[in-house]
């Protein structure tokens, strides 16, 4: 039985369709209900509508609202402030880790990543 069988909702936010699709396949196979966004603004819209249990957010997304700013917006919004957020980045780790956590992210994960390590991180954050 997949670990996410309770159909917890996860929103994947990344401008790279390949990353979104890899995460989609990996997490759906674990039983999670997946939503996707390619921009910060779209992520905010989906999060307000769907109320995901977890958001996996790329730190560098286009559309005028980068991942850290989007995280800050979501954490300051009464409708979405309880969503858990894992920041995903291929950039300088320590600097971005601090910025992410300061913005309200619950955890941080580096690219490239192994799907199994990401599943473990998701389970850890969701508790």
Please provide the spans of the model-predicted regions:
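His-Asp phosphorelay/catalytic-motif detector in bacterial-type signaling
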Residues: 51-53, 79-84
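C-terminal output helix
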Residues: 113-122
């Amino acid at each position: 039985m997949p670990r996410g069988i309770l159909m917890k909702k996860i929103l994947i936010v990344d401008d790279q369709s390949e990353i979104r699709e890899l995460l989609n396949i990996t997490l759906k196979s674990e039983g999670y209900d997946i939503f996707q966004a390619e921009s910060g603004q779209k992520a905010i819209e989906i999060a307000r509508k769907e109320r995901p249990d977890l958001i996996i957010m790329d730190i560098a997304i286009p559309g005028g609202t980068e991942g850290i700013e989007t995280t800050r917006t979501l954490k300051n919004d009464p409708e979405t402030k309880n969503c858990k957020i894992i920041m995903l980045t291929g950039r300088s780790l320590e600097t971005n880790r601090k910025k992410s956590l300061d913005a309200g992210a619950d955890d941080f994960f580096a690219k490239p990543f192994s799907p199994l390590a990401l599943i473990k991180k998701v389970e850890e954050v969701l508790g």
